[in-house]
From Swiss-Prot:
This protein's name: Ribosomal RNA small subunit methyltransferase I
PROSITE patterns: RSMI
Source organism of this protein record: Vibrio cholerae serotype O1 (strain ATCC 39315 / El Tor Inaba N16961)
Annotated GO MF terms: rRNA (cytosine-2'-O-)-methyltransferase activity
GO cellular component, one term: cytoplasm
Family under the similarity heading: Belongs to the methyltransferase superfamily. RsmI family.
Keyword annotations of the record: Cytoplasm, Methyltransferase, rRNA processing, S-adenosyl-L-methionine, Transferase
Top EC category: transferase
Alphabetized NCBIfam families for the sequence: 16S rRNA (cytidine(1402)-2'-O)-methyltransferase
Location(s) in or outside the cell: Cytoplasm
HAMAP family linked: 16SrRNA_methyltr_I
Catalytic reaction list: cytidine(1402) in 16S rRNA + S-adenosyl-L-methionine = 2'-O-methylcytidine(1402) in 16S rRNA + S-adenosyl-L-homocysteine + H(+)
Length: 288
């Protein structure tokens, strides 16, 4: 820890301030300090953010900056920054710019020599990934799936053969159609995780083969409600051997006492599996 000063004097600064995605307890003290200390807060929706600010007794004035006016209003905010005002940028929930407004403002700030200071904080993409059980060493956030089926399938075709985990946002009124398009493009065996209502009372994180997930959602209308994140397991070659959970548990236990290479050989013999596949899994998930 070096300096906990919130808004320094001198050079203009735009603060990127994440806000809770559901649970108000997730806001950081630093975020509250910045929001209370700046001269102005650029917000996606003045009414929505107004409730958040009122909850924490913050009276800083707000400035509406959303998808429909950002390109026109970004320069207005840059001019205010250059005149000496301090400004924080927030979205309705989560980290600004992540499928939310702010890109044009940040770009123009950097071009004008305004310092941009990001605060860490809530983000549905990372929150969902951390609990999904899908590989997290290589992933991409793809934003919202397109609203039209043709465009949606084209997007899914783009990621059909990539090995990384792909993450999407989706709205509840399109979730069934989107999963059906996924089924058509990716097949019923592809593992998909649905994370909905993250950090809220009815938080649900469910992962299973796509065909089973579609059935699971259809069984209860409540499972179609709320803010949603879809996480898609990366492509695996049909010839790539699938490792059973029991074998992976055995390998995990043995590597506590044996070198990975030897443990993989033993598990391969016990479970009639390929040693190289076990060794590769161990390197990726357990370390040498």
């Amino acid at each position: 820890m070096t300096d906990n000063k919130t808004v320094p004097n001198g050079a203009p600064i735009l603060y990127i301030v994440p806000t809770p995605i559901g649970n108000l307890g997730d806001i950081t003290q630093r975020a509250l300090d910045v929001l209370a200390s700046v001269d102005m807060i650029a917000v996606e929706d003045t009414r929505h953010t107004g409730k958040l600010l009122a909850h924490f007794n913050i009276s800083t004035k707000t400035f509406a900056l959303h998808d429909h006016n950002e390109q026109q209003k970004a320069q207005v905010l840059v001019d205010k920054l250059l005149s000496g005002l301090s400004i924080a940028l927030v979205s309705d929930a989560g980290t600004p710019l992540i499928s939310d407004p702010g890109y044009h403002l940040v770009t123009q700030c950097r071009q004008a020599g305004v310092k941009v200071v990001p605060l860490p904080g809530p983000c549905a993409v990372i929150t969902a990934l951390s609990a999904s059980g899908l590989p997290s060493d290589s992933f991409s956030f793809e934003g919202f799936l397109p609203a039209k089926s043709k465009a949606r399938k084209d997007k899914l075709l783009e990621i059909a053969k990539v090995s990384r985990t792909c993450i999407f946002y989706e709205s509840p009124h399109r979730i069934c159609e989107s999963l059906q398009d996924m089924l058509d493009v990716l097949g019923g065996e592809r593992e998909v995780v649905l994370a909905r209502e993250l950090t809220k009372t009815f938080e649900t994180i469910q992962g299973m083969p796509l065909a089973e997930l579609i059935t699971w959602i259809a069984e209860d209308d409540n499972r179609k409600k709320g803010e949603m994140v879809l996480l898609v397991h990366g492509y695996r070659d049909a010839g790539e051997q699938q490792l059973p959970d029991e074998a992976l548990r055995t390998l995990t236990i043995l590597t506590k006492e044996l070198p990975l290479k030897k443990a993989a050989a033993l598990v391969a013999e016990i479970h009639q599996l390929k040693k190289n596949a076990l060794y590769k899994w161990g390197l990726e998930n357990l370390g040498e």
